[in-house]
Amino acid sequence: MILTIDNILTSEELTELTDILSQGNFVDGQTTAGWHAKLVKQNSQLDKTAPEVKSLEALVINALQRNLLFKLAIHPKHIHSLRFSRYEPKMHYGSHTDNALMGGQQFFRSDVSFTLFLSSPESYEGGELIIEKPEGDLSYKLNPGSIVLYPSTFLHRVETVKTGTRLVVVGWVHSLIRDTAQREILFDIDTVRRSIFAKDGKSVEFDLLAKTHANLLRQWAD
């Protein structure tokens, strides 16, 4: 399941984030790429040792954790390995798949990948996120403060930036539900049960769906 959420950041959070990043020290993005992804990665990233990194990570993680749609669809256990990435003219990230395990001393799975857009789409040419699916490529270039989340199993790439600057936050989620099909089933059931509750209250139909949702979550969560 691929999901987009608009305005995951407030306007104040977006301004704070972009203002701090405009003064940040960016380094070669290849330092955080896997051995094969290094061959196709050309961007820069905020130095992970910079003093502002912790507060910026907390800002983004808090924004995600307070969003109900994110929680219902993703079932996050750990949000991790955030990167504050910048693409300038001629920079790109070729087709690649994300590492299955990420982290420093403690490893987390990459079940769900996300890109949080910080730059206005009109401010740069190119730079689309392309998710490669068997039935065809999907292209994403969202408004600032909006996010796209997708299974980390997909090949994906970032097209070459021709003009302007593309600023994004990328990161990964270790989900309680590792299988994308199971996450989608739970999300669909949850959506229907909430709709029934809104119309009919705590009905017999709601109780049956609530029981099924809870039992599947109990069976699948790890």
Swiss-Prot record:
Q: Which UniProt keywords apply?
A: Dioxygenase, Iron, Metal-binding, Oxidoreductase, Vitamin C
The GO terms this record gives for MF are: 2-oxoglutarate-dependent dioxygenase activity; iron ion binding; L-ascorbic acid binding
The cofactor note from the UniProt entry for this protein is:
Binds 1 Fe(2+) ion per subunit.
KW Cytoplasm (keyword) present: no
Q: Where does Fe cation bind?
A: H96, D98, H156
Q: Where does 2-oxoglutarate bind?
A: R166
All copies of the Fe2OG dioxygenase domain together span 78-175
EC assignment: the record states: 1.14.11.-
Question: Per its Swiss-Prot or TrEMBL entry, what cofactor is needed?
Answer: Fe(2+); L-ascorbate
Q: Which SMART domains match?
A: P4Hc
Gene3D superfamilies given in the database record: q2cbj1_9rhob like domain, Rabenosyn, Rab binding domain
Identify the PROSITE patterns for this entry: FE2OG_OXY
Q: Does the record carry ATP-binding as a key word?
A: no
Q: Provide the GO biological process annotations.
A: DNA damage response; intracellular iron ion homeostasis
What InterPro entries is this protein classified in?
Answer: Oxoglu/Fe-dep_dioxygenase_dom, PKHD_C, PKHD_hydroxylase, Pro_4_hyd_alph, Pro_4_hyd_alph_FE2OG_OXY
**HAMAP family xrefs:** Hydroxyl_YbiX
Under what name is this protein listed? PKHD-type hydroxylase cce_3668
Q: What is the lineage of its organism?
A: Bacteria, Bacillati, Cyanobacteriota, Cyanophyceae, Oscillatoriophycideae
